[in-house]
Amino acid sequence: MSENSTPERVVLLDEQHQPTGTALKSEVHTEATPLHLAFSCHVLNPDGRVLVTRRALSKRTWPGVWSNSFCGHPGPHESFEDAIARRARQELGLEIRNLTVVVPEFQYRATDATGVVENEFCPVFVAVTDTDPQPAESEVAEYAWTAPRDLIAAVESAPYAFSPWLGDQVREPALREALG
């Protein structure tokens, strides 16, 4: 559900990433998930450490795995900037600044252990915050601030402990450069 308690909708896309319609988020993630619009955000603190989160055990897909700071879906007619600020507040209680897209054409498809598919065109952003998270229990089981090089090393040595999209993202040179 979104902040105003209306069911969340996602933007469906064709193979050229053009909108073709919308669908309820609660109904779109299945064994045959259509391509849809999303985003991933990596949040840095003033010390240059990156926030990683462990997905809540109640999450439908990839419960309990470590991932990037947060992800989400822009609603119909919602800008990435507004959607990212909304999800930062909802999921982590964070105010963010210096939002920058670092991998604008990121796309992935992955199937979790239950057979549910993620199929997203998902630009990757980096932002900065000055505060510690106040995570929503329904979204985040735990979190940690870590040096970017330590995150990359952990993902490379134990990829099964991390979300598949994070594994793909840390291989992107532009993200590595942005994280420092």
Swiss-Prot record:
- Identify the catalytic residues: C71, E120
One term under GO cellular component = cytoplasm
Q: Which GO terms describe its molecular function?
A: isopentenyl-diphosphate delta-isomerase activity; metal ion binding
EC number from the UniProt entry: 5.3.3.2
Tell me which residues bind Mg(2+). E91
List, separated by semicolons, the cofactors it needs.
Mg(2+); Mn(2+)
Main subcellular localisation: cytoplasm
Where is the chain membrane-spanning? Answer: none
The record's Gene Ontology biological-process terms are: dimethylallyl diphosphate biosynthetic process; isoprenoid biosynthetic process
What does the note accompanying the cofactor annotation read? Binds 1 Mg(2+) ion per subunit. The magnesium ion binds only when substrate is bound.
**Location in or out of the cell:** Cytoplasm
Q: Where does Mn(2+) bind?
A: H29, H36, H73, E118, E120
Catalysed reactions, as listed in the record: isopentenyl diphosphate = dimethylallyl diphosphate
Q: Which UniProt keywords apply?
A: Cytoplasm, Isomerase, Isoprene biosynthesis, Magnesium, Manganese, Metal-binding
Q: In which pathway does it act?
A: Isoprenoid biosynthesis; dimethylallyl diphosphate biosynthesis; dimethylallyl diphosphate from isopentenyl diphosphate: step 1/1
Its function, per the record, reads: Catalyzes the 1,3-allylic rearrangement of the homoallylic substrate isopentenyl (IPP) to its highly electrophilic allylic isomer, dimethylallyl diphosphate (DMAPP).
Query: In which family does this protein belong, per the annotation?
Result: Belongs to the IPP isomerase type 1 family.
> What's the protein here called?
Isopentenyl-diphosphate Delta-isomerase
Gene symbol here is: idi
